[in-house]
Amino acid sequence: MKKLILGACMFMGAIGFSQDNGYFFGGLESNSQWLLDDEDFGFTAPEDQFRSNNYLQLNYTLGKFTAGVQYEAYLPTVLLGYSPTWENQNGIGTYYLNFKNETLDITGGYFYEQFGSGLILRTWEDRQLGINNALKGLRVKFTPTADLDITGVYGQIRNGFDVSEGVMQGVDANLDLSSLMKVDAIDLKLGASYVGRYQSNGSNDSIPSNVNAYGGRLDFVANNFYGGVEAITKDPDVIVNEGTVSSPQLFDGTALQVNLGYAQKGLGINSTFRRLENFSFYADRYAEGNVYNEQIVNYVPGLTKQHDYLLSNIYVYSAQPRLLFNDTEKRAGEVGAQVDVYYSFDKESTLGKLGTKIAGNFSYWAGLEATYNDAEQTYDAKFIGDGDRYFRDLNIEVKNRWSSKWSSIATFQDVIIDKGVA
């Protein structure tokens, strides 16, 4: 398939000017393509060859108030590969009004929010991926002291130019323990989150109307070491696959993520362990597993190296948090880890004079080892076990700067991926 890009980002970024103590700012982004026939791939261009996604954002700030609106047009039709939800649509996508002072930050309308690492809640916009799951409702942030902040949200997740059937609510709190206890040797922060979804079950009382998730986290920095742990549990809910309830049983979900790292001049080490069991979360239970990530509540990225070059990025891993329990496929989630090591040679050394930098990465992700009881529709998963391997990547990168005009990058990569899953 061949594409002629007519205007990838006509212009994107901030434009602004002030007037009578107020301030306007915003931006325009236009991404267009013209699809052509490609005989080599047997691709015939659709009737709507010209496609365009366009975004116009305008904001105005006056004193402690800020208001904004975003107009979107997917005309004459949306770019190929985006959700049909946007097909031939245009109109006001988002709008908001915000008030902010030293202790209060209140937003009504559409807003974006993240609790912790995003494992329990993250709403965001990514135009390149066609994702916009902004919350429409009310957000209140309260910062009574420098050591404590509390955020409350209530609303519905955006779905195209509409909103989700499910109603979301949540509370997040962060406490600076080191400051509170006047401890200087270590930076210690404690966080707790709650996110709930209400969605009518119609006349089916076996489906819960309310599904809640609860999480806690602890982060630290001590000298050159840093780390954190976040654990979340989600109430039992039905399993949905392709818009249909696939099991009469209810299953709870859990998530655990642990980070540990070390940093000093010339050396950095970062490691992450994560275990997800039945931990997908959507504003509409029937949206679970949709390929466009519409109405998704939390953020569960694949924790692997983001390579610089296209050839390496052919092998992309997507996280597998879902529980699938049917005749053709059974899996309960994923478990794995990633380690990054960065090293820069001292500038006075031979390699340091060449600007030599070495980066190494290893990641391994597998399914949870579990036993399944088809008759009773139950399963039992081990904490780690020896589940099927989904993805493994070992890579080393060496960068040199030989002169002001010449530099080189040498990369070794050994990757295994199960494309049937990842």
Language-model regions, residue ranges each:
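Bacterial Sec-dependent N-terminal signal peptides
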Residues: 1-25
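Short loop/turn motifs that connect adjacent beta-strands in outer-membrane beta-barrel proteins
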Residues: 18-24, 60-67, 99-103, 107, ...
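Short glycine/proline- and aromatic-enriched beta-strand/turn motifs that initiate or cap beta-hairpins
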Residues: 19-45
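Exposed, low-structure sequence patches enriched in small/polar residues
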Residues: 29, 47, 51, 183, ...
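Transmembrane beta-strands of outer-membrane beta-barrel pores
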Residues: 30-36, 62-64, 71-77, 101-103, ...
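Outer-membrane beta-barrel architecture
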Residues: 57-59, 68, 95-98, 139-141, ...
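Outer membrane beta-barrel
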Residues: 59-61, 65-157, 260-285
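Hydrophobic, small-residue-rich alpha-helical packing segments that form membrane-like cores
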Residues: 131-214, 219-222
